[in-house]
Amino acid sequence: MSIHIVALGNEGDTFHQDNRPSGLIRTYLGRSPLVSGDESSLLLNAASTVARPVFTEYQASAFGNVKLVVHDCPVWDIFDSDWYTSRNLIGGADIIVIKYNVNDKFSFHEVKDNYIPVIKRALNSVPVIIAAVGTRQNEELPCTCPLCTSDRGSCVSTTEGIQLAKELGATYLELHSLDDFYIGKYFGGVLEYFMIQALNQKTSEKMKKRKMSNSFHGIRPPQLEQPEKMPVLKAEASHYNSDLNNLLFCCQCVDVVFYNPNLKKVVEAHKIVLCAVSHVFMLLFNVKSPTDIQDSSIIRTTQDLFAINRDTAFPGASHESSGNPPLRVIVKDALFCSCLSDILRFIYSGAFQWEELEEDIRKKLKDSGDVSNVIEKVKCILKTPGKINCLRNCKTYQARKPLWFYNTSLKFFLNKPMLADVVFEIQGTTVPAHRAILVARCEVMAAMFNGNYMEAKSVLIPVYGVSKETFLSFLEYLYTDSCCPAGIFQAMCLLICAEMYQVSRLQHICELFIITQLQSMPSRELASMNLDIVDLLKKAKFHHSDCLSTWLLHFIATNYLIFSQKPEFQDLSVEERSFVEKHRWPSNMYLKQLAEYRKYIHSRKCRCLVM
């Protein structure tokens, strides 16, 4: 017998005395007297083997002979990129633990607004524990105004934690530190209570099944075999960060050039990427005005570091293209300018690798004061208007998702004319876009804009065979690396669009979405739905979606009694029909045995255990 625990969220950086990373779950497993196995044997998937693991799996023995399996998911990426795995994790859990750091209010609200609704839909009457970890720092006096209580201070209040627990029907715990009292007696006591409850429930269900099997001593009914295992689709890893990083090195679609104070060319870049991470560049490139930003430090940083040069007498200006030459920007600070190529590489890589940036700057600037000065200027460039600079602790920021800037900020420019240099014409309407992002994220677009094609020199580009809604969803994926189709039909349209532009990862995402939607449908809904599953299969085959077409064939075979009654079942090819008949569930042999058993039961006037 086993117990499956899923732990979600990041309680903050905690360390053993020998500086090995630890946390709430690992500390409990290492200290609890009910859990056997030394600490080194608990970890199955070591974090060192993967750059940013989705989850860490632990296995141990509890209560002597009960297998304990724990999946610790410190980041929430799994809910953004992999519906299939996240749904299976939540659905298969016996106990769920949601943990957060009381001093990270931004992450708490991000989780509460974006991920808690997803978890609520996937919960299956399992106990949930909300663990608020840490001692509140710089906690302000509570405000009596009912309109601002939840936003007061920089810490997550007890009231907010309790409110979250009420939404999930969860047990709320405050763990001020990860010591023996809070881990062993407080958190451990509650967790072990729910573990015992889960064991009791599983034992009761097992006894009921055994009692039913022993209650009949006559001829046994035919055994219904399990359906064949469905093919498992593995999601393709994201290369979003590397796509944007490669854009800096390939120098395609450049629209801004930086010069040093001596008017010598330093590096080329792209306005859209710079504006996605920095309000300083938004102000510099007139995407936003000082009135929009209303932050004196950002305005001062822009004025102190950069100046735009539009002088026609500028060296090399006569050789620039007459169409739309790159914007010339003078970097006023000589030290900052000498490190600009490293700073841009840091920004294009996701703006989170602070240690690497500092190491690169130290190689160029020997004086530690100069290094600190340049690092502070980078932090000012990345500052959010109206807020205290949250990047002062680089180590804390480095623990965040590397795509934190791009995923949210590039969406700001989606279907907006700001900085747009290409316009798509679809179904009589226009959709503005940015060549740099399209070239970086889509090889077909890169070939189209850089080859000897009409689109390379044209601003207005017509798009055929795709609806506006589908194309906007396609662009949303290119800009943000994520998408959420409204349903199976839209997902298939998006899959076709992805195949047309050869974006394989988006195809896999659409395949997983369709599979997840179909798997979640009960039999009654499958029988009554208007979706033509055979037509879906033929489209998947036509557009080279081999994984989806294979899965759909198994799905039709597994639900044979439902789909064989539908008219479209006759549209299957001879080869497809043969496959379905071979792998059908329940099998034809079982149905014959069941008919004979029912005939015997009725002749004996016994009570049938199956029907």
UniProtKB/Swiss-Prot annotation:
SMART domains hit by this protein: BTB
GO biological process, one term: regulation of proteolysis
Region listing for Rho-like, in residue ranges: 1-175
Record keywords: ATP-binding, Golgi apparatus, Hydrolase, Nucleotide-binding, Repeat, Transport
UniProt tissue specificity: Ubiquitous. Highly expressed in neural and cardiac tissues, pancreas, placenta and testis.
BTB domain mapped to chain residues: 254-356, 420-487
Annotated spans, Interaction with Rab9: 420-611
EC numbers for this chain: 3.6.1.-
Matching InterPro entries: BTB/POZ_dom (IPR000210), P-loop_NTPase (IPR027417), SKP1/BTB/POZ_sf (IPR011333), Small_GTPase (IPR001806)
A Pfam family annotated for this UniProt entry: BTB
Cellular compartments annotated: Golgi apparatus
GO MF entry, a single one: ATP hydrolysis activity
GO CC terms, sorted: cytoplasm; cytosol; extracellular exosome; trans-Golgi network membrane
UniProt superkingdom: Eukaryota
CDD domains: BACK_RHOBTB3, BTB1_POZ_RHOBTB3, BTB2_POZ_RHOBTB3
Gene3D superfamilies: P-loop containing nucleotide triphosphate hydrolases, Potassium Channel Kv1.1, Chain A
Physiological role: Rab9-regulated ATPase required for endosome to Golgi transport. Involved in transport vesicle docking at the Golgi complex, possibly by participating in release M6PRBP1/TIP47 from vesicles to permit their efficient docking and fusion at the Golgi. Specifically binds Rab9, but not other Rab proteins. Has low intrinsic ATPase activity due to autoinhibition, which is relieved by Rab9.
Assembly description: Interacts with RAB9A and RAB9B (at lower level compared to RAB9A-binding). Interacts with M6PRBP1/TIP47.
Note on domains (UniProt): Although predicted to be a GTP-binding protein because of the presence of a Rho-like region, binds and hydrolyzes ATP. In contrast to Rho-like proteins, the conserved Asp residue in position 138 in the G4 region is replaced by an Asn, decreasing the ability to bind GTP.
Protein's recorded name: Rho-related BTB domain-containing protein 3
Species this chain originates from: Homo sapiens (Human)
Lineage start: Eukaryota, Metazoa, Chordata, Craniata, Vertebrata
